[in-house]
A protein has these predicted regions:
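Active-site SXXK
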Residues: 97, 115-141, 165, 232-236, ...
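Short, charged, amphipathic alpha-helices and their helix-cap/turn boundaries
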Residues: 98-103, 146, 181-218, 242-261
Length: 385
């Protein structure tokens, strides 16, 4: 097992714990943190929350084929062996825009399920930053965020280079690992502790100001920090002069050809929770994965941004070491030449540029991911690089 894999597994063992109704309760010995009721709600998505705001399906849906035998393909023995019904709920494998295998834990989900994604939303936020750069709203990632966002001025996030916000290295707080990505107890109490109930009421900028320790100049140390992502959303809004969700809908969701709409959690003041809470159908996550791979391969502004986004920009501190991190994107991800979007409990969109293999996972335990990663490597080995 390589160092990156070990570090990501360490991340899983610690888990990105989200507290629901004031408690985090282990429900089994497979690493699930949170009640079965929490995960039942999570599997249904968060669009029912009164503070969720929707994005529409794309006017032009991109191609995604579904093999006729995808529920019982030649990969069934391999996937079934890796799939743990105690913690795994959906696994979808797709090769170059063709879904080759699907598996659903029918106790909890079905083909119509639209689970939430937790911190996978962070990676979506980075994609929006890339589009803002390529549209000319932002000149480059080596400028300070305060050049574009007056509300971030005087904070660590405003002083930080945009590159460093993307790499989770704002320097705002002491680099001490937080399993939730909340740098202070107040941030935890006012965001994740309330987000899954639709009860976030605190204005995010004032919360950031209170949490800002101005620990170090940006770029010195990676720290998984939800507020770095939130700063990026404000940056996009202020640079483009549009609501983040409107810009994201047009530049990412419609551009990649989503077949269904999605929704994103907001606070009661209408500020997007950029760090968590995007809900969509798994097929559209798969479409997004292929879109990222295809755009990354192009010699365009966005292609260059994606290449940077998927190369090491920082080392994010973990309980037992650190992990390579790009622009709001995890690197390594269990082998091959992969990078991935990760969320609490094992939500995952995994992509391999050399093979074109994309995997979507909805689960309740990140620490139980090892079998799925081994399966992914085995499937990837069937495709020439």
């Amino acid at each position: 097992m390589n160092v990156r894999t070990k570090n990501l597994l360490a991340l899983g063992l610690a888990s990105l714990t989200i507290f629901y109704a004031g408690a985090a309760l282990a429900q089994n010995n497979k690493g699930q943190i949170g009640t079965d009721q929490f995960w039942a709600d999570f599997s249904k998505g968060l669009e029912w929350l009164p503070t969720s705001k929707s994005v529409s399906a794309s006017p032009t849906v991109s191609n995604l084929e579904i093999a006729t035998d995808s529920l019982n393909s030649s990969l069934s023995p391999l996937v079934d062996q890796a799939f743990d019904p105690d913690v795994h709920r959906i696994v979808i494998l797709s090769h170059k825009r063709s879904i080759i295998h699907r598996k659903y834990n029918e106790r909890w989900v079905n083909e119509k399920s639209r689970p939430s994604s937790a911190s996978m939303a962070k990676s979506l936020t980075a994609l929006a930053v890339g589009k803002a750069i390529c549209n000319g709203a932002i000149a480059n990632v080596d400028e300070s965020a305060s050049v574009y966002s007056s509300r971030l001025r005087g904070t660590s996030w405003g002083n930080a280079k945009i590159r460093h916000l993307l790499a989770m290295s704002s320097g705002s707080n002491k680099p001490v690992y937080s399993p939730t990505g909340s740098p202070t107890p107040q941030v935890q109490a006012e965001t994740l502790a309330k987000s899954y109930q639709g009860k976030m009421t605190h204005e995010f900028v004032s919360l950031m100001v209170k949490a800002d320790e101005k620990y170090a100049p940006s770029g010195q140390q990676g720290l998984y920090n939800n507020l770095d992502t939130q700063a990026l959303a404000f940056l996009v809004e202020d640079a483009t002069r549009q609501k983040f969700i409107e810009f994201f809908e047009r530049e990412i969701w419609h551009a990649m050809g989503a077949s269904q709409g999605g929704s994103w959690s907001h606070n009661s003041l209408g500020q997007v929770a950029a760090f968590s809470g995007f809900t969509a159908h798994p097929y559209d996550w798969i479409r997004l994965g292929h879109y990222v791979l295809e755009e990354r391969a192009k010699d365009t502004c966005f292609g260059q941004f994606l290449k940077e986004a998927t190369t090491r920009q920082s080392q994010v501190v973990l309980p037992n070491g650190s992990a390579a991190y790009g622009f709001q994107t995890w690197l390594g991800c269990g082998g091959v030449d992969t990078f991935c979007f990760l969320g609490h409990g094992g939500q995952r969109l995994q992509m391999s540029p050399s093979t074109g293999l994309v995997m979507y996972v909805h689960a309740t335990s990140l620490s139980a991911s090892q079998s799925l990663l081994a399966m992914y490597r085995s499937v990837a080995s069937r495709y020439p690089k």
